[in-house]
């Protein structure tokens, strides 16, 4: 339990730093749409789909190593990189500014693009192993 907790913490720290870097890098691109969080969630969904397929298909790892990889990268890094709470706060901020249609569009694009990304990531990796 202690090692898994450490792996989640390390992965989460790096994921949060990567999210911060991406949101800072994209802040000047759009003042209305929270592009950084949108990209984090879409990229994270793509990667989690790829990781799911990789861990299912590859025989490189035994079950114990797969658990360590999953806790470090999926639960830790991607948990720190993607964020539902920031997404929700961004929506609240848009609504408070009266930008209802932008908020609705942001919700739709975020959910649909993230879902498409996780499916795409999964099947890209599954295709490699078939």
Swiss-Prot record:
Gene Ontology biological process: cellular detoxification of fluoride
Reaction(s) catalysed (UniProt annotation): fluoride(in) = fluoride(out)
PANTHER family registered for this protein in UniProt: FLUORIDE EXPORT PROTEIN 1-RELATED
Transmembrane segments: 2-22, 36-56, 71-91, 100-120
A GO MF label: metal ion binding
Localization per record: Cell inner membrane
Role, per record: Fluoride-specific ion channel. Important for reducing fluoride concentration in the cell, thus reducing its toxicity.
Superkingdom classification of source: Bacteria
The family this protein is said to belong to: Belongs to the fluoride channel Fluc/FEX (TC 1.A.43) family.
Predominant localisation class: membrane
Keyword flag Ribonucleoprotein: no
One Pfam family named in its UniProt record: CRCB
Membrane association type: Multi-pass membrane protein
Coiled-coil region: none
Alphabetic keyword roster: Cell inner membrane, Cell membrane, Ion channel, Ion transport, Membrane, Metal-binding, Sodium, Transmembrane, Transmembrane helix, Transport
Protein name: Fluoride-specific ion channel FluC
């Amino acid at each position: 339990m202690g090692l898994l907790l450490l792996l989640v913490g390390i992965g989460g720290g790096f994921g949060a730093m990567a999210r911060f870097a991406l949101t800072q890098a994209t802040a000047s691109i759009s003042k209305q749409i929270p592009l950084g969080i949108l990209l984090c969630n879409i990229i994270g969904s793509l990667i989690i789909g790829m990781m799911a397929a990789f861990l299912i298909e590859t025989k490189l790892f035994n079950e114990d190593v797969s658990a360590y990889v999953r806790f470090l990268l999926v639960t830790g890094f991607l948990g720190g990189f993607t964020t539902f709470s920031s997404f929700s706060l961004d929506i609240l901020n848009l609504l408070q500014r009266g930008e209802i249609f932008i908020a609705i569009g942001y919700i739709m694009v975020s959910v649909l693009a993230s879902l498409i990304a996780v499916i795409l990531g999964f099947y890209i990796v599954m295709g490699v192993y078939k």
